[in-house]
Amino acid sequence: MWILGHRGASAAAPENTLAAFSLAMTQQATGIELDVYQVEDEIVIIHDRWLNRTTNGKGMVTSHPLSYLRSLDAGNGEVIPYLAEVFEILPADAVLNVEIKHLSNVD
């Protein structure tokens, strides 16, 4: 059986942030569930289509450049992470459940 931190340990840290993912793993989660959007050539981790609920930004995730998205506060000073950054902090045996919200140019 797997125990997944939904959007990380989102009850204790800002959801879908590196802090939430790291905390979930310290709380004996087997892995994490996260949500992804493609923006430019990167995969970013955020749940909502709109930035307003989880960041100090406004508008749709996919209507902004990466530089703007990375400048936002996703809670407690956390930034919107890239998927590659999540791979860097998770243990090699962690389970990863990825919910694809938006991808463009998929071959």
Language model feature labels by segment:
Residues 1-107:
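Phosphate-group recognition and catalysis centered on beta-loop-alpha active-site segments
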